[in-house]
Design a protein with these regions (language model features):
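Sec-dependent N-terminal signal peptides
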Residues: 4-13
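Structured catalytic-domain cores with a bias toward divalent-metal coordination
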Residues: 2, 18-246
């Protein structure tokens, strides 16, 4: 009888221990450069999504809708503006995925830094970046999909000179396009109705964006760019990418 109680106790310990171990593996808080990110998971998938600019509300709404219909992990920045507060300045979170990009991002709104303080800030961002990328990057079979909106005239034509292959559709608005970093993904996406560009070589113009960091890490990356306010269009583009690459 005693042996039965011992075995039962060991079984309970194993069950609760396993649950606690799984909880311990989850990040207590997801932060990067002092700003928080929320995480929404739907099922078990190697597809990761990220929304980086808080002022691009159409992209967020498209994301909210998409993650409820498609499996994956979606990371949402908890901020309402394009830039996020950092130390005594503001930085664009999509310009600090390299040390070079971080340098220019930090100096954009604060040109002068007391001796030693800029290096310290860069070192802190470097440390934060390593931890953040470990969380958001998918495994080797996965893909990282970001969503952005444009409202200042930015369009696919700005990306042509940095792209090795392009598929431009005359019937499509140039401000709506897909950027990818794998040739196989490009070939699949180019068969669809949307503008698509392939950037699979790291450029000297490294601006600190997530696309270049993904390329350096050999991670499949896709950016879905759409005009601010064109929610239906961005929903369709997201669905097309997910259905085409999975």
């Amino acid at each position: 009888m005693l042996n039965k109680f011992i075995l039962f106790g060991l079984a309970l310990s194993f069950i609760y221990g396993s649950d606690n171990a799984e909880k311990d593996n989850l990040p207590k808080a997801i932060t990067f450069a002092g700003v928080n990110f929320s995480l929404i998971e739907n099922g078990n998938s190697a597809v990761h999504y990220i929304w980086l600019h808080g002022d691009e509300k159409t992209a967020k709404m498209a994301f909210d809708h998409h993650i409820s219909h498609f499996p994956g992990k979606a990371f949402f920045i908890q901020n309402d503006d394009r830039e996020v507060p950092y130390l005594q300045t503001r930085v664009d979170p999509n310009r600090i995925f390299s040390r070079r990009g971080s340098y220019y991002a930090l100096k954009k709104f604060k040109p002068y830094w007391p001796p030693g303080t800029l290096k310290k800030a860069l070192d802190e961002i470097d440390k934060d970046r390593i931890q953040f990328l470990e969380i958001i990057m998918p495994n080797k079979d996965g893909v990282l999909i970001s969503v952005h909106n444009n409202f200042r005239g930015y369009n696919v034509k700005y990306e042509l000179k940095y792209s090795r292959k392009t598929s431009i559709k005359k019937q499509q608005n140039p401000r709506d396009f897909i950027l990818c970093t794998r040739e196989k993904d490009f070939e699949k996406l180019a068969n669809g109705p949307y503008n698509v560009v392939l950037q699979d070589t790291v450029s000297e113009r490294d601006d600190g964006s997530l696309s270049w960091e993904s390329l350096r890490q050999n991670v499949r990356y896709v950016n879905i760019e759409a005009r601010l306010g064109y929610l239906t269009k961005q929903k369709k583009m997201l669905a097309f990418v997910s259905e085409t690459l999975n």
